[in-house]
Amino acid sequence: MPIGGVLRYNDLQTINRCRWFMIDSQLALFEGTIENNIVLGRSYIPYSDIRWALRFTELEEDIDAFPQVLKSNIQASGKILAPTHIMRILLARTILAHPQILIFDGILHNLQPTMRETGLRRLCSKDEPWSVIFVSNDQNLTPQVDRRIVRD
């Protein structure tokens, strides 16, 4: 299993960080509010975009159930977030940037099957502005993708 590498896109050796976003299998949030974990210091992001990201990731109802909604502290919420919640918060953070490329490295295995299928369908929709790269050995991704590359 490789531990490093280079990402090349259209023969460019360096890709502007605003144009791509990667989520790996290390599901980690930082201590702070749910909003801070999603917005990640990007104060220019409008509240309507945050709500869109919550709807896209099917987090809206769950987050709205917290006493302080988006202002709820990750550590002080009184319960430990499930890996599916953490993954969807990271996904919400990612799509807020409207990147051209989304890269997922083994993270989708943590989702429940129905949530996973819905998420894959939304992420891979032709209506979305991004291209998606999945680094995975999961054969079930095949129906959702246009092209599959197998590494020998």
Regions inferred by a protein language model and the residue ranges of each:
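ABC-fold ATPase nucleotide-binding domain signature/coupling loops
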Residues: F30, E60-I89, R93
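Conserved catalytic loops of ABC-family nucleotide-binding domains
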Residues: T114-R116, R121-D138, T142-P143
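ABC ATPase nucleotide-binding domain "signature" loop
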Residues: H109-L111
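Conserved post-Walker A segment of ABC ATPase nucleotide-binding domains
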Residues: M1-R55, E117-T118, C124-E128
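Catalytic Walker B motif of ABC-type/P-loop ATPase nucleotide-binding domains
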Residues: L102-G106
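Conserved catalytic segment of ABC-fold P-loop ATPases
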Residues: P143-V150
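A short, proline-enriched helix->beta-strand linker immediately N-terminal to the Walker B motif
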Residues: L96-Q100, P129
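Hydrophobic beta-strand positions within the nucleotide-binding domains of ABC ATPases
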Residues: M22-I23, N73, V135
